[in-house]
């Protein structure tokens, strides 16, 4: 994997067409929302001037994934600890299955977090991981996210 070949760009109408071709048939929508849901969330964030972005991920000029990191809107199911200060919510992160395991996801995650911090300020980050998604659990724990006992539906909350 050559980091110089990785690019991230804001998701827009044009590049979202290419994101539909990402191979993710091994990841249930119980684990990560569909692209259509991600685009709905993205449009909501844009319309309401939320802090954050949804990014398209490219490798060698080919669209291979997307990641959504936005300022969190409080949910009734959020733990009390999250209601004390503003935070970001990572809501979707998919890498085409042909490009996993080579460091692209790790690189993109850190780059997007850093960009969000630089643009909007440092805040805690929360995300949910389905209780049966052990691969995602390992990925996030290895990147300094802490698994909690709090759950929203079938998802455990993770904080960083």
Report residues per predicted region.
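Acetyl-CoA-dependent GNAT
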Residues: 2-6, 10-98, 109, 115, ...
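C-terminal "cap" of GNAT-fold acetyltransferases
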Residues: 3, 84-88, 122-137, 141-160
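Short glycine-rich loop/turn motifs that provide flexible caps or phosphate-binding loops at active sites
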Residues: 64, 102-104, 127
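Conserved glycine-rich acetyl-CoA-binding loop
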Residues: 96-110, 131-138, 142
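Short coil/turn segments at alpha/beta junctions that flank glycine-rich nucleotide-binding fingerprints
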Residues: 102, 119-123
């Amino acid at each position: 994997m050559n980091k110089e070949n990785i690019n991230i760009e804001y998701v827009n109408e044009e590049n979202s067409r290419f994101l539909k071709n990402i191979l993710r048939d091994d990841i249930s929508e119980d684990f990560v929302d569909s692209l259509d849901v991600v685009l709905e969330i993205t449009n909501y964030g844009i319309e309401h001037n939320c802090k954050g972005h949804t990014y398209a991920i490219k490798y060698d000029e080919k669209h291979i994934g997307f990641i959504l990191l936005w300022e969190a809107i409080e949910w009734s199911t959020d733990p009390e600890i999250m209601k004390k200060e503003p935070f970001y919510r990572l809501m979707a992160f998919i890498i085409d299955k042909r490009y996993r395991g080579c460091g692209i996801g790790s690189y993109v995650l850190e780059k997007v977090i850093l960009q969000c911090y630089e643009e909007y300020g440092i805040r805690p980050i929360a995300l949910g991981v389905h209780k049966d998604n052990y691969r995602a659990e390992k990925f996030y724990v290895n990147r300094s996210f802490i698994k909690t006992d709090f759950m929203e539906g079938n998802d455990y909350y993770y904080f960083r």
